[in-house]
C-alpha cells in the first residue's frame, strides 16, 4: 500500500508576481526548488495565508537567486503580490519508506531567501 506524505515545503514564501495571461503553473526560483527537492513540472499545492485559497498546480523553474514566486494563469486571481504562501509537494511511499522518510522544509524570509532548513515540523511551532 502506498500512502501520501509531504516531501518538500517552502514555508512563508512571498508572492513576487501574478501573471494571469500565462498558460498556468507557479514559477519558483530554481535555488529554492533545489533546496527542498521539488522538480520542474512536479505537482505542488499552494496555500495563501492571506485569504485561505488553496490550489494545485505544477512547478516551473525561475531564475536562480531571483527569489521569484509567480502564480500563473487562473491562480493569479487568488494570489496578490506580497501574499505569504506555503508551497508543498507530496510523495507516495511504501510502509518501508515511511520509516526513514524525512521531508525537506525551507523557511523563507521576506525576500524569499532561505532563513532556516528543517528536517521535521515540530507540533505547535509558530515561525
Curated annotation (Swiss-Prot):
GO terms for cellular component: cytosol. The modification Pyruvic acid (Ser) is found at residue 25. Its EC number is 4.1.1.11. The active site is at residues 25, 58. One of its GO terms (biological process) is alanine biosynthetic process. Substrate binds at residues 57, 73-75. Belongs to the PanD family. The gene is panD. It comes from Exiguobacterium sibiricum (strain DSM 17290 / CCUG 55495 / CIP 109462 / JCM 13490 / 255-15). SUPFAM superfamilies: ADC-like (SSF50692). This is Aspartate 1-decarboxylase. InterPro entries: Asp_de-COase-like_dom_sf, Asp_decarbox. Is synthesized initially as an inactive proenzyme, which is activated by self-cleavage at a specific serine bond to produce a beta-subunit with a hydroxyl group at its C-terminus and an alpha-subunit with a pyruvoyl group at its N-terminus. It is an enzyme of class 4 (lyase). It is found in: Cytoplasm.
Amino acid at each position: 500500500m502506498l500512502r501520501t506524505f509531504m516531501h518538500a515545503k517552502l514555508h512563508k514564501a512571498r508572492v513576487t508576481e501574478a501573471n494571469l495571461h500565462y498558460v498556468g503553473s507557479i514559477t519558483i526560483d530554481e535555488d529554492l526548488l533545489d533546496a527542498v527537492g521539488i522538480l520542474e513540472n512536479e505537482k505542488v499545492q499552494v496555500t495563501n495565508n492571506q485569504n485561505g485559497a488553496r490550489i494545485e498546480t505544477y512547478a516551473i523553474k525561475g531564475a536562480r537567486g531571483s527569489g521569484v514566486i509567480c502564480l500563473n494563469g487562473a491562480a493569479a486571481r487568488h494570489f496578490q503580490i506580497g501574499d505569504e504562501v506555503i508551497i508543498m509537494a507530496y510523495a507516495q511511499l511504501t510502509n518501508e519508506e515511511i520509516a526513514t522518510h524525512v521531508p525537506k522544509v525551507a523557511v523563507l524570509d521576506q525576500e524569499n531567501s532561505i532563513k532556516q532548513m528543517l528536517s521535521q515540523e515540530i507540533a505547535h511551532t509558530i515561525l
